[in-house]
């Protein structure tokens, strides 16, 4: 997860004979963006320094080597952070605590309170989150196309709320509240989170 360790390993693997596909993942800049935000000096400095290191590595690799750089998601600075601990009227509707991600929140709602939950949630969060039933969520292929994993139904509850704004709903319980709020995060539906670069370097 350290770029200064990743690059030497890539170079070493490239020296081995034969064709190969090397996949490398680095925890940063994701970790720095979570901690300091998208407009932070810490994140921008890291990215600039990493660009220089990758450029140097690319020049030293054989001419038949192609380097592809991308990300698994973008990032969005958080401007408003909610906790469901402040909304007992929402908690009352739930079988168990919400889960998944702070910008893609899964709810397990009591069967006899589904209508009430929809009305209450949309009244409080409707301008910042898009609430869908599990069926709507899956019909819209929000998890992609192909065969559905057999555990999907166990993980996504019967309602999903997706952030369409700069807001998040913290995943907290009364036993573990007060966690530090991330300056920036992902998993919502904004352009900043969903669009990623694809950089191709070849000689």
Locate each region found by the language model.
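Feature captures the catalytic ectodomains and active-site-proximal regions of enzymes
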Residues: 1-203
